[in-house]
Swiss-Prot record:
Function: Catalyzes the transfer of a methyl group from dimethylamine to the corrinoid cofactor of MtbC.
Protein name, as recorded: Dimethylamine methyltransferase MtbB1
GO BP terms, alphabetized: methanogenesis; methylation
The entry's keywords: Methanogenesis, Methyltransferase, Pyrrolysine, Transferase
Amino acid sequence: MATEYALRMGDGKRVFLTKEKILEELEAGMANASDLGEIPDLSADEIDKLAEILMMPGKAVSVEQGMEVPVTHDIGTIRLDGDQGNSGVGIPSSRLVGCMTHERAFGADTMELGHIDYSFKPVKPVVSNECQAMEVCQQNMIIPLFYGAMPNMGLYYTPDGPFENPGDLMKAFKIQEAWESMEHAAEHLTRDTVWVMQKLFASGTDGVNFDTTAAAGDADMYGTLHAIEALRKEFPDMYIEAGMAGECVLGMHGNLQYDGVTLAGLWPHQQAPLVAKAGANVFGPVCNTNTSKTSAWNLARAVNFMKAAVQASPIPCHVDMGMGVGGIPMLETPPVDAVTRASKAMVEVAGVDGIOIGVGDPLGMPISHIMASGMTGIRAAGDLVARMQFSKNMRIGEAKEYVAKKLNVDVMDLADEHVMRELREELDIGVITSVPGAAKGIAAKMNIEKLLDIKINSCNLFRKQIQ
């Protein structure tokens, strides 16, 4: 009897497949992406590599040593303190505690602060509270800390917003009115996002993470791209990450263009150049998981889309890898075996520059991804590599080489806790354990500025405050 391997369905249910069936599923998933996106197939060696990863006997797998990448985040601390019946685990804790837990306990390379409603529009009435939370976090943390939220253009339509719902207008055959409603909503999205981030940047945030861009279709993406463009023009040093909501931009409007390119119907490899053109530092491409297909089918499809996006992108790509995207099952508690295999495959086959950790419980998301492919933050040198990706748009190889040269170590040493523990204390750039007298927070980041020859926004704010 042929050997069967334990895999997952797209909803997380365990399924057992033979090697022949796994290869068949991989080929089919890859072909689906190739057909839809009009992109090249994966090579036979790449298909074999994916099969090898899926058939590994261990419950958890990881990238080869030296191939680790930085991680970024969606939903911030909500996975810890949130309790809305999805992936939050309802731990009563402040957002400062949540952010520092990710930095010091999970070994995150970056982190983000976010509002419980996690959209830009609801932040407007409480922006002063968000600014205070950001200042306190920046004073205590070393890793890059973003402000994250969804553009979420749906909130600008009735009954939540001022503009009539274009879906209702379309049903009444009021097409022109529907277009105008979307265009007005996009303008307000741009305005509100820029206003919120002006306040947060003045309070020390390293940058912004646009999560689930284009969730409401092409007008949502249009508004977000113009927000990125405006923020880049006003704040040349702001870290900007733009993550997508889905693999294909839905043409709710159909006629909107950015830089002469129609937004409706764009696939990840076509989205990347526009996001870079707008001024983002890092692009977060997405491939949706099909819950009725196997993890082999979903993974090959996702890897094929992401490989094409990485090759087409002028900026680093941090693939979105929460539940339901990136070959990961749609389950609030993502299976560790599926998450770590998808994480490894994205790094080793798709060649991504980083992983954007998305929705899922703490063990299934940040812990699993960081164990599988992360650089472990200030336990090693993950925060330093991430800063070079965001401050200079460096791809993963260039960023690692730059940091290694500054530290006078080998690239392999950047994820070596033994090497970096002693070196971080010697350079006074912040250590993960509480060492009396060692530089922490702003002081550590000021030393990082000198080491990497960059400027850090929270340090600039501190310098202004003591003049």
